[in-house]
């Protein structure tokens, strides 16, 4: 695949709209975790969403769950506890989506859900989008509102580290989702 094809395959960035909540995906990397949390908080503060759902248990059992750390960061900058939903068991993108869906169902929020803003790193947005579309009930609109820091569509080819991650993600996405992923 060419760099342009990889860019079109992976990088999804849409303008935020008013939504029922923002679903903020965790990250093992602390800098990515902070960037994603900041983006979720920005969407909350700007009035796009009335609540944040932070999701991620973390890969290492020895560390505090990603979602708990994100909730702490959000509270430190003024997001009230009442406006935070915390899903702290999952450790894969699929588990993030499944466990978040289940949490929303348990809280009685899934049935009325119309629009959800998705927050992750931009180069992971296609995977996130395909996963939530496959996991959540049909009819929910998902809008990709990634961080604009780190590896982005504008800069990923300039950094060898970003380039490695992005190429690996494109290969994994095509292997896992096949032709569905290739039709953005």
Can you name each region flagged by the protein language model?
Residues 1-166:
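A structural signal for short, hydrophobic/glycine-enriched beta-strand patches
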Residues 157-184:
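Glycine-rich flexible loop motifs, especially short His-Gly-Gly/GGXG/HXGH segments used as catalytic or interaction
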């Amino acid at each position: 695949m060419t760099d342009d094809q990889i860019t079109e395959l992976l990088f999804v960035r849409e303008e935020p709209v008013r939504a029922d909540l923002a679903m903020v995906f965790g990250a093992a990397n602390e800098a990515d975790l902070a960037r994603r949390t900041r983006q979720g908080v920005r969407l909350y503060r700007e009035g796009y969403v009335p609540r944040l759902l932070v999701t991620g248990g973390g890969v290492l059992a020895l560390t505090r769950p990603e979602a708990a750390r994100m909730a702490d960061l959000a509270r430190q900058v003024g997001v009230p506890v009442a406006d935070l939903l915390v899903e702290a068991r999952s450790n894969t993108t699929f588990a993030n989506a499944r466990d978040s869906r289940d949490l929303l169902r348990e809280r009685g929020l899934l049935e009325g859900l119309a629009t959800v803003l998705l927050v992750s790193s931009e180069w992971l947005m296609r995977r996130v989008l395909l996963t939530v579309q496959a996991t959540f009930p049909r009819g929910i609109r998902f809008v990709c509102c990634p961080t604009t820091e780190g590896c982005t569509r504008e800069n990923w080819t300039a950094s060898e580290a970003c380039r490695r991650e992005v190429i690996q993600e494109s290969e994994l996405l095509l292997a896992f989702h096949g032709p569905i992923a290739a039709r953005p």
